[in-house]
Amino acid sequence: MLLLKHGRIEILDQNTMYGWYELPKQEFLNGEQPEPLTHYIKQFPLMKHVNPLENKKDACPMKWLLLSAPITNHWFN
């Protein structure tokens, strides 16, 4: 789950609600992704309207997707 919290984006575990990774909002928005996010939304169309806590079948692929996305810092390169 991605949450915007005090200007930061945080990825949370659906089961424990424990923060996995926190990244400044601007850095997240400037990060280069290998494919546009709309590509993944097309792969998982139900995720837009489904609560993953109620539907574990859809939560697993989305959690894998969020945790496997490359996050790079271009500010210091």
UniProtKB/Swiss-Prot annotation:
Location in or out of the cell: Plastid, Chloroplast
Assigned keywords, A-Z: Chloroplast, Plastid
Presence of the UniProt keyword Plastid in the record: yes
Main location: plastid
Superkingdom of the organism of origin: Eukaryota
GO cellular component, one term: chloroplast
One Pfam family hit: Ycf15
Membership in a protein family: Belongs to the ycf15 family.
Protein name: Putative uncharacterized protein ycf15
Organism: Liriodendron tulipifera (Tuliptree)
Origin organism lineage: Eukaryota, Viridiplantae, Streptophyta, Embryophyta, Tracheophyta
